[in-house]
Design a protein with these regions (language model features):
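N- or domain-start disorder-to-order transition segments that initiate the globular core
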Residues: 12-42
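Basic- and aromatic-enriched surface patches that contact anionic nucleotides/nucleic acids
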Residues: 2-9, 14-22, 45-173
Length: 173
């Protein structure tokens, strides 16, 4: 394998023979409340777009969680160094974190059903709602490369790009 590039057959070989895919379910409390876990997660790798959700969209997302709506999974890539990069779901991940850390007050415009939560931050909510939020399960799909010679950063980026081009059924079908 060339040190700087991967040919399509090399990418295919890595994806078929060396790509480990794990599906996990984790509570928001475990995902964001565990200091050790939080230190490993890089939610803003250089190839991700910046956080772009406005407070109305972020509010709508938080309300969806509180109402029990199914949300798309977060997609992680575990590097050889043990860090976990968010390769899909940065907006969702960062919104979850902002809300829990008190950096997001819910807006009237973003709330469709739970209007009484207008202007509230996580810390303003009653314990029942806080527990509901923390106990909410988030689906996570985690990719990693196993049994493969060390990849360069560029090669790893090419693999991540390929992962993002899959449709969900291609991953598990």
């Amino acid at each position: 394998m060339d040190k700087f590039t991967l040919q399509s057959d090399e990418i295919e070989s890595i994806l078929k023979n060396h790509l480990k895919i794990e599906s996990k379910v984790m509570s928001i409390e475990t995902l964001l409340g565990n200091v050790r876990m939080r230190k490993k997660i890089v939610y803003d790798p250089y190839y991700q777009r910046n956080y772009v959700w406005d407070t109305d969209k972020a509010t709508y997302f938080i309300e969806s969680i509180l109402l029990g709506t199914e949300i798309p999974p977060l997609v992680f890539f575990k590097t050889e160094q043990g860090t976990i990069e968010v390769i899909d779901g940065r907006q969702r991940y960062e919104t979850l974190s902002k809300f829990l850390n008190g950096n997001l007050a819910l807006t009237k415009k973003g709330l469709t059903s739970l209007k009484s939560l207008h202007k509230q931050k996580y810390s303003d909510m009653n314990e029942k709602i806080q527990d509901l939020y923390l106990d909410t399960k988030i689906r996570i799909i985690e990719f990693s490369i196993v049994n493969e010679p060390k990849l360069t950063d560029r090669q790893e980026d090419l693999i991540k790009k390929e992962i993002l081009s899959f449709q969900p059924m291609q991953l598990f079908g």
